[in-house]
Amino acid sequence: GKYICITNVHTTVMAYEDDNYKNIQNKAALILPDGNPLSSLSRKKGFKEAKRVTGPDLMHEIFKISEEKGYKHYFYGSTEDTLSQLNIKLKERYPKLNIIGMYSPAFKSNVSLENEKKIKEINASNPDFIWIGLGAPKQEIWMSLHEGKLNGVMIGVGAGFDYFADKIKRAPMWMQKYSLEWLYR
C-alpha cells in the first residue's frame, strides 16, 4: 500500500533540514497541509483549492464515508489503553465503522521493520485504511519502510487516536481557525 502524510510547519522544517525525511515526505502518495501557513502558501503557489486538513478532521470524514461504504480500518500505534478507549469511543460515535484490528507496538528509540508475522496479520485482515499514530517523524519513517508491504492506505495521524479516545481535547474552533491550536496545547 501507499501512504499519506499530513504535514505541518514543524514537519516541513524537519524535511527542509533532513534530506532523508524530505525524501520520505516526497515519496508519499499524497501530502496534506495541516496548518494555515502551509495551505496559504499552497494557494499562492497555484493550488487554488488548498485547505487545511488535520488528522482528526480527515479521520472523521473517512469514518463517515466508511460507515456507508463498509471500508475496513486497522489502527497501529499509541498505547494499549488509548487503543482500548479509541475502540469504545469510535463504536459509540460511528456504530457502523468496521474496525478490524488495533495494535500498540513496543516503544523503541529507533524505527525498525515489524516482523513478518505482524505484517501478515495486518494483511490477513484485509484493511482499506491503516491509521498510524506514532507521531512525527516516526510514523512517516514507519510508513515509508512498509510501503508496498502492507495492503491498504496508510495514513499518519499523530495524536489523532488520542483525540478520538478523548485523551486530549482539541482546541476550540476559533483557535483552530486562527492557527492558534499550538497555544492551546
Regions found by a protein language model. Name each.
Residues 1-57:
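N-terminal nucleotide/polyanion-binding subdomain common to many enzyme families
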Residues 9-12, 134-139, 160:
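Short glycine-rich anion-binding loops that position phosphate/pyrophosphate groups of nucleotides
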Residues 71, 150-152:
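A short helix->loop->beta-strand "cap" motif at the edges of active sites that frequently abuts
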Residues 122-136:
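Proline-aspartate-enriched helix->loop->beta-strand connector
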Residues 38-40, 138, 160-165:
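Short gly/pro/ser/thr-enriched loop/turn and capping motifs at secondary-structure boundaries
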Residues 39-121, 125:
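Conserved beta-alpha
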Residues 87, 140-149:
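Short Gly/Thr/Asp-enriched flexible loops that form oxyanion-binding sites at enzyme active sites
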Residues 104-110, 152-185:
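Short, flexible loop segments at boundaries between secondary-structure elements
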